[in-house]
From Swiss-Prot:
Modified-residue entries (N6-acetyllysine), positions: K568
Organism: Pongo abelii
Residues given in the record as L-arginine binding sites: S133, P134, N135, H144, Y322, D326, Q350
Transit peptide: 1-16
Alphabetized UniProt keyword annotations: Acetylation, Aminoacyl-tRNA synthetase, ATP-binding, Ligase, Membrane, Mitochondrion, Nucleotide-binding, Protein biosynthesis, Transit peptide
Entries under PROSITE patterns matching the protein: AA_TRNA_LIGASE_I
Protein name: Probable arginine--tRNA ligase, mitochondrial
GO BP: arginyl-tRNA aminoacylation; mitochondrial translation
InterPro entries per record: aa-tRNA-synth_I_CS, Arg-tRNA-ligase, Arg-tRNA-synth_N_sf, ArgRS_core, DALR_anticod-bd, Rossmann-like_a/b/a_fold, tRNAsynth_Ia_anticodon-bd
EC numbers for this chain: 6.1.1.19
GO cellular component, one term: mitochondrial membrane
Catalytic activity line of the entry: tRNA(Arg) + L-arginine + ATP = L-arginyl-tRNA(Arg) + AMP + diphosphate
Motif annotated as 'HIGH' region, chain positions: 133-144
Function: Catalyzes the attachment of arginine to tRNA(Arg) in a two-step reaction: arginine is first activated by ATP to form Arg-AMP and then transferred to the acceptor end of tRNA(Arg).
Amino acid sequence: MACGFRRAIACQLSRVLNLPPENLITSISAVPISQKEEVADFQLSVDSLLEKDNDHSRPDIQVQAKRLAEKLRCDTVVSEISTGQRTVNFKINRELLTKTVLQQVIEDGSKYGLKSELFSGLPQKKIVVEFSSPNVAKKFHVGHLRSTIIGNFIANLKEALGHQVIRINYLGDWGMQFGLLGTGFQLFGYEEKLQSNPLQHLFEVYVQVNKEAADDKSVAKAAQEFFQRLELGDVQALSLWQKFRDLSIEEYIRVYKRLGVYFDEYSGESFYREKSQEVLKLLESKGLLLRTIKGTAVVDLSGNGDPSSICTVMRSDGTSLYATRDLAAAIDRMDKYNFDTMIYVTDKGQKKHFQQVFQMLKIMGYDWAERCQHVPFGVVQGMKTRRGDVTFLEDVLNEIQLRMLQNMASIKTTKELKNPQETAERVGLAALIIQDFKGLLLSDYKFSWDRVFQSRGDTGVFLQYTHARLHSLEETFGCGYLNDFNTACLQEPQSVSILQHLLRFDEVLYKSSQDFQPRHIVSYLLTLSHLAAVAHKTLQIKDSPPEVAGARLHLFKAVRSVLANGMKLLGITPVCRM
């Protein structure tokens, strides 16, 4: 695997540079493949060496690269050494490259790339990831969908790297909307509708009561009183609220299952209605709580009255706010999990909110506030189903399934499937996830169903098609050829390009683990699929001599394995037929 070759190169460099091999590992990177020319397999960035050097005179880097290359020697691992633009390049012995990469992919299976030396020495951590977090009775909007798939990716990757991950869905299950919802259900609610479709019915009630409250002050007052009863622990009010919450969570679990997403804990703002009062007392005891003329309580994070740094933590009637409950939740999670890192995945509109929450934790004396991290993402515009704006996650999933079924029906090569609905949903979800993950998470983008479902080009449909096609090859030829293979049979440019690309998988995983951007993995998998498409046309298995056919089948099997591994990390279930 790449790290074995990296170490061999690092050991030779360490003797010349008088540096420990460990210091050189991350400076040696696999070279991205080129369609125009054959490239080396690894390169050493001379810039990065000079950054490690305390001598800042920085002589001509190209001269330095040439001098260094002249001191190095080819050996059983490295067959050629050359210089590039500010780099020293290394070509690996071709037979060794073929044998090592294919053996490693087959032996490591789903762990390929994750055992790399790039990750060795990194401590195993306990990581809390809070994501999805819809509001009960309100729309499950596109922001919640993005939070769900991004949070799931981060949790998947961290878990694959051996960290202990706790996935939390922090529901919006408290606040004034429940005053409206409780009052609304007493006025317009139906028990049968609630039991049969809780999310839909609660949303309908919520929309109706909001209209009524806008026109009728007595309804607005009743809603306010209902929420105050909830805050005071009234048994009847709490019983109704609990029913709404339990039925909603049951429905969420069912729908998340279709997405392939699960949570270790369904938490919510309601858990912290009492603990938020303790937070207010602590803020007051530290002299941080200020009262306004309106009777609200605020914290001045600037210390000099800067209006942009004022954070409201209590309403005039003494009830808690979102920020107060987030503070209580963070403190509770540290007590419960003693986490090393806590990651919040929400849209970029909440950036200031989390900055203030983390800052308040710090001035309250919690040094671990530095372990809290916000992963923000941009806005998606224009995602609509045929029924109109997205209201529920299930609307999106049903739309995906319907559109993909229609696409599959219109394509002549579509196979006969045991469960076309399931396949359509998996392919459609891959399409949705790849469209979302192709760019920077922070970027806004305009959604297009037509672009999502293109079977050609850089789409999720193309990834699924490639996986299914490679699986079909294994089904057709696998039994007879998957024994020992001759590495000398994989020296064509198409084979070498694939092997070079497989070398890079650990670096791509490392990049994504550092910046939480799935685009590195997406770009890698799309390139791998394009390479496989070219190889599928030129590297025939049928009618080839057995040892050639066997070697090629091993190569395609390795591609399919790595493709499946990457897709699963992104939250995509690979399909075997489509």
